[in-house]
Regions:
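FAD-binding subdomain of flavoenzyme oxidoreductases
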Residues: 83-183, 191-192
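N-terminal glycine-rich flavin-associated loop
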Residues: 1-16, 36-79, 91-124, 160-167
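Conserved glycine-rich FAD pyrophosphate-binding loop
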Residues: 25-29, 189, 209-292
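Short beta-strand
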Residues: 16, 76, 183-189, 244-248
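Helix N-cap motif at beta-to-alpha junctions
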Residues: 168-171, 196-204, 233-237, 258-260
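N-terminal accessory segments
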Residues: 1-23, 261-266, 290
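Terminal amphipathic helices with adjacent charged low-complexity linkers/tails
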Residues: 195-208, 212-217
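Short acidic-glycine loop/turn motifs at beta-strand connectors
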Residues: 29-30, 47-48, 113-117, 188-190, ...
Length: 292
């Protein structure tokens, strides 16, 4: 049994505290829940295999620094907080089209169950891995199915060239369809910013393909993102007002206010309830939070 498993124990409500940067997501934790902290540290990193084993309490800043030193990066967003918090929140990096989806990047997860047992699912490589669906369940679960101790993440090389460009007259959906492989297409209602990455000739070719649909200028980086993440359908952007940044082709936007909880169908409620009861029959893990 790991030290973290002993800390979590097998009885009483418990919650993991990370950087509290996304503490508002998914509802308020019950005040009686005992607070614990996950272990931290980059345990192993093999740039040649493009995998890193990192403990959940490690800050994303520390992980980013370790990967950058080797010329690599990962799918976790770099908005502060811890690795474990980022995984259970399930928020993709704004550059998800280039970095990859978080659910596909978590190769293995080690977590503590509601009974206080150490559970491991997935593996350091995708081939011949049993239980590969388990990490996908943990991503975005808000710690309601298990308390994450450690993960193995897929990494990828930092492209030789990255260039953000902005247009005030280009349609963002046309942009997303025109560029072969953009790493990000962001729209704030008045301007579109696109991240082009790859070898210099590839970036130049992508930029050239954009000149027919708008005037473009180079900018330093992405928009500043509001605090709250929303999910949306493309048609819903037409009536969007206020401050927002939408990730075109991803179905994610960030706004100043939290998104109202959607009405769930009876079948979704039934499936989520059965899943929660299977993983946490006593409801002791992050009580008060809901991934739905």
């Amino acid at each position: 049994m790991s030290d973290f498993a002993k800390l979590v124990g097998a009885e009483g409500p418990v919650t993991v505290v990370g950087g509290r940067t996304r503490w508002h997501v998914g509802g308020k934790v019950h005040p009686d829940a005992r607070e614990v902290h996950a272990p931290s540290g980059v345990m192993s990193y093999d740039p040649a295999e493009m995998t890193v084993t990192v403990r959940a309490g490690t800050t994303t800043t520390e992980l980013t620094a370790a990967l950058t030193e080797a010329g690599q990066r990962c799918a976790l967003p770099e908005r502060g907080g811890t690795v474990g918090g980022s995984v259970v929140i399930g928020e993709n990096h704004p550059e998800v089209l280039g970095r990859g989806w978080l659910t596909s990047s978590v190769l293995q997860v080690t977590y503590i169950s509601s009974e206080g047992r150490l559970i491991r699912g997935g593996g350091p490589t995708v081939k011949n891995v049993s239980g590969f669906d388990l990490p996908r369940l943990i991503v975005g679960s808000l710690g309601t199915l298990g308390l994450v101790e450690e993960v193995i993440l897929r990494t990828n090389p930092i492209p030789p060239r990255s260039q953000w460009v902005e247009s005030h007259d280009a349609d963002p959906f046309t942009v997303a369809s025109r560029v072969l492989r953009p790493s990000a297409v962001l729209w704030n209602g008045s301007s579109t910013r696109v991240l082009l990455e790859g070898h210099t000739p590839d970036v130049a070719a992508s930029l050239n393909s954009l000149t027919s649909i708008g005037a473009w200028s180079e900018v330093d980086g992405s928009f500043d993102l509001p605090q709250h993440r929303w999910s949306f359908q493309p048609a819903e952007l037409n009536g969007c007002s206020g401050t927002f940044v939408a990730s075109i082709g991803v179905g994610t936007a960030w706004r100043d206010e939290p998104q109202p909880r959607p009405a769930l169908s009876p079948s979704v409620i039934e499936i989520s309830t059965r899943m929660k009861n299977n993983f946490d029959p006593t409801g002791r893990l992050n009580p008060g939070r809901s991934a739905f």
